[in-house]
Each structure stands twice: as C-alpha cells, then as structure tokens.
Amino acid sequence: MSWQTYVDDHLMCEIEGNRLTSAAIIGQDGSVWAQSATFPQFKPEEITAIMNDFAEPGTLAPTGLYLGGTKYMVIQGEAGAVIRGKKGPGGITVKKTNQALIIGIYDEPMTPGQCNMIVERLGDYLIEQSL
C-alpha cells in the first residue's frame, strides 16, 4: 500500500458524515511522504519545532504550534506521542510514529475527538508495523 493510499483512505475518510480538511504523513526529517491536495505548504522549521516538542514536551506551549504559517494554541496532548492544537472552531492533531508524523487538520463540524481518533488510529497501526 502506498503512503498516498494511507492518506486518502485512512486519514481523509468519512467519520459520522465528517472529514478532515487536510492530512499528511511527513517524515521526521520534514520530507513529505504523502499529503492531501489541500495540505498547507509548511516550512522545515515548523516540523523541527514539532519534533523538538516531542523530544522536550512543553516547548511549543508558550509560542503555539505553527504549520503552514497558521498558529494553533497547544492544548492537552500525550507527552512525546501526540500534540494537539486548537484554532477557532478547528484544530490539528500530530501523532509521532517511529519514523513519521501523522498530521490531521480539521474544522467544524468535525470534532477534536473525531480528528484525534482518525490520526491516532493510523499512527498506532504504523507503530505496530515498526514504521
């Protein structure tokens, strides 16, 4: 299965009638493995900042999480495993696997819980596959 298939079928899937607005699988080095057509163009330093927060949880909280120039307020996540952010009626979930970052971006009517479930389910599966 290609990485694009994971994005198309497992991240951009429908859940209770809702979908993520965009999603991607990004290597921990910032390389794009696969992404939805609407995923924002991000800067390498934004991925570096996310990786730094996984290494030292809490580093993004004072400044916020930036992706594609959009600032998300960092909310409760799982130290070293999941970073969650909020911006208005939407937000972002970033799940770290052994080699990649699974990123989902959502807006209403999708809920934070639905986004978390989609992103973390794929992340957990890839971790089980040692990816």
From Swiss-Prot:
Primary location class: cytoplasm
Localization per Swiss-Prot or TrEMBL: Cytoplasm, Cytoskeleton
Domain of life: Eukaryota
UniProt keyword annotations, A-Z: Actin-binding, Allergen, Cytoplasm, Cytoskeleton
Listed GO CC annotations: cytoplasm; cytoskeleton
InterPro entries referenced in this protein's UniProt entry, alphabetically: PFN, PFN_euk, PFN_sf, Profilin_CS
GO molecular function: actin binding
Pfam families in alphabetical order: Profilin
Self-association state and partner proteins as the record states: Occurs in many kinds of cells as a complex with monomeric actin in a 1:1 ratio.
Function comment: Binds to actin and affects the structure of the cytoskeleton. At high concentrations, profilin prevents the polymerization of actin, whereas it enhances it at low concentrations. By binding to PIP2, it inhibits the formation of IP3 and DG.
Similarity comment: family membership: Belongs to the profilin family.
PANTHER family according to UniProt: PROFILIN (PTHR11604:SF59)
Protein name: Profilin
